[in-house]
Design a protein with these regions (language model features):
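Internal alpha-helical scaffold of NAD(P)-dependent oxidoreductase catalytic cores
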Residues: 85, 103-112, 128-152
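Residue-level detector of alpha-helix initiation sites
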Residues: 18, 74-75, 99
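Active-site capping/gating segments
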Residues: 40, 115-130
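Rossmann-fold dehydrogenase core element
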Residues: 90-94, 104-120
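NAD(P)+-binding Rossmann beta1-loop-alpha1 motif at the extreme N-terminus of oxidoreductases
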Residues: 1-57, 61
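Short, conserved loop/helix-junction motifs that constitute active-site signature segments
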Residues: 5-7, 31-32, 82-88, 107-108
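Rossmann-like NAD(P)-binding element
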Residues: 43, 47, 57-86, 91
Length: 152
């Protein structure tokens, strides 16, 4: 799946710090429409509004992807708050270190889940990432996760 194909269902990004921001900039540069993105971050950077990325308002009903890009110590609260967004056909993609697939599966019991571990240069678009999926993450979900992580 190409990033432009996500424009119909949307992408929700929870956390837009260094890594989340680097990912989003890469996705936008590769064809993801700003209006297809909804960022959830209490300290959303100003450049989001400048590029037309929403930080307020309702979430898409059935986003194609829910990306979790918060620090591991914040993940417990995020999983509780965002469990409804990771249902149906939504791919849950996490770039947080130290949180197991089992923890994500408790929050999103029916979801395809992929954990990605980008290295530090990914924050400036020069990195590589390792990815691993749960049993529900088939070839299509893994390919989508790989496409998303290739942006950095």
């Amino acid at each position: 799946m190409e990033l432009a194909e996500l424009n119909d269902r949307g992408l929700v990004l929870v956390g837009c710090g260094r890594m989340g921001g680097a990912l989003l900039k890469g996705w936008l540069a590769r064809g993801l429409a700003p209006e297809a993105v909804r960022v959830i971050d209490p300290n959303a950077p100003a450049w989001l509004a400048e590029r037309g990325v929403a930080t307020e308002g309702p979430l898409p009903d059935d986003p194609a992807v829910l990306v979790l890009a918060v620090k591991p110590q914040m993940m417990g609260g995020v999983l509780t708050e965002r469990a409804a967004a990771g249902q149906g056909d939504t791919l849950v993609l996490s770039v947080a270190a130290g949180v197991t697939l089992a923890a994500y599966e408790r929050a999103f019991p029916d979801a395809a889940i992929v954990r990605a571990m980008p290295n530090t240069p990914a924050a400036i678009g020069q990195g590589i990432s390792a990815i691993v999926g749960n049993a529900r993450a088939g070839a299509a979900e893994m390919a989508l996760a790989e496409t998303l992580m290739a942006a950095v």
